UniProtKB/Swiss-Prot annotation:
Cross-link (Glycyl lysine isopeptide (Lys-Gly) (interchain with G-Cter in SUMO2)): 179
Name of the protein described by the UniProt record: rRNA-processing protein UTP23 homolog
Gene Ontology molecular-function annotations: mRNA 3'-UTR binding; mRNA 5'-UTR binding
Function recorded in the entry: Involved in rRNA-processing and ribosome biogenesis.
Length: 249
């Protein structure tokens, strides 16, 4: 049973890898229901998931999932501990948390650009995930981890792309670049370039003024010394002339 289960997982992974760019490390988004099922089945996720998927994995969750487990109380305390050990991915609900299922759906929205796996026991969430092509779905059944086969919507999408009826991933990227060039989509790289251009400038006029003031200050004491020396010489000549006049008299 274990060998056939791994064969199915290898086949499904190959499908998602070839058609949707899924690659290692496999990023698996866990919700509270999956953590609770792993706790009841005594499944060591960090050990068993890499063996089952035959590759490096990263266990991930979101702040909304952690907040949901925290509000549910002591009954899901063990599941909360499992989720807290996962890497927390940033979600758009930092100020106003939503339910765990809604949050995970938002993480795989717009074509699942980060190639997340969704691991859940929630049937409603599973149905919604299957409606979006290209999202690997995982669940636990009879204390064993299972990677679900590609959904009918996913298979139909791949066939339509191969037949030329839908836009492929590469074409979507080129369309996005054109929109960025026309200013329809904000490009973070352009922002960085603009910021760099603003930083480049001429010398600060205030610094130039300070330098001139310093130069004037250095000249002023020298001129005062010269004037003092001239006065001293005049006084000495007057003394000599007075002494000569006294001697003649």
């Amino acid at each position: 049973m274990k060998i056939t289960r791994q064969k199915h997982a290898k086949k499904h992974l190959g499908f998602f890898r070839n058609n949707f760019g899924v690659r290692e490390p496999y990023q698996i988004l866990l919700d509270g229901t999956f953590c609770q099922a792993a706790l009841r089945g005594r499944i060591q996720l960090r050990d068993q998931l890499p063996r089952y998927l035959m590759g490096e994995t990263q266990l991930c969750t979101t702040r909304c999932v952690l907040k949901e487990l925290e509000t549910l109380g002591k009954e899901l305390y063990g599941a909360k501990l499992i989720a807290q050990k996962c890497q927390v991915r940033n979600c758009p609900h930092f100020k106003s948390p939503v339910s765990g299922s809604e949050c995970l759906l938002s993480m795989v929205d717009e074509g699942n650009p980060h190639h997340y796996f969704v691991a859940t026991q929630d049937q409603n969430l599973s149905v919604k995930v299957k409606r979006t092509p290209g999202i690997p779905l995982m669940f636990i059944i009879q204390n064993t981890i299972v990677l679900d086969k590609p959904s009918p919507r996913t298979v139909a999408f791949v066939k339509a792309v191969e037949a030329g009826q839908l836009v492929s991933v590469h074409e979507k990227q080129s369309i996005k670049q054109l929109k960025e060039e026309q200013g329809l989509v904000r490009n973070p790289d352009l922002r960085r370039r603009r910021r760099k251009k603003k930083k480049v400038g001429g010398p600060n006029p205030l610094s130039c003024l300070k330098k001139k003031k310093k130069a004037q200050d250095t000249k002023s004491p020298a001129s005062e010394k010269k004037r003092k020396r001239k006065r001293i010489r005049n006084r000495s000549t007057l003394k000599v002339s007075s002494e000569q006049q006294g001697a003649e008299g």
